């Protein structure tokens, strides 16, 4: 599922996340994890489940669904658009009853669903820890090395690479590239 995440206004990323029994996972969750681990308390993550659509377009889509399927229950408002449980979560956050027929929903209620689907917030409670890590941060600061040669600017003749340096690249093999 494509979406964009924003971690406390600090970092944005576009790609896939997975909802699991322990929280979010997937490539974009990994990409944002360093900011989450070092960002302190009271962080919030915002997900946009319809990045490719503006609010008005998404509202038009929901209004059309209401017009074409008036007897459909509100819990199915996002059917065919999102995974069922996720659609229900949006409807619940909007304060709607699951069994309310779409014909009973006004534009303001549909707009509330749009706003939540386009800015779905979750509290960041932490990261899984070292045993679950795919990459670790820490090491010698890259500021202490020539970016072209990886020679130490403090100890000439000393060259380092890989995980000795404080680099945690994006998902997709970028950390492996540094390790070689």
Short names for language-model regions:
Residues 33-36, 148-149, 172-173:
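Residue-level detector of alpha-helical segments with a strong bias toward transmembrane helices
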Residues 167-180:
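A conserved FAD-binding loop/helix module that cradles the flavin
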Residues 1-104:
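An anion/pyrophosphate-binding glycine-rich loop and adjacent beta-alpha core
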Residues 13, 117, 179:
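Short strand-loop-helix active-site module centered on a catalytic nucleophile
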Residues 88-168:
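A glycine-rich dinucleotide-binding beta-alpha-beta segment and adjacent secondary-structure elements
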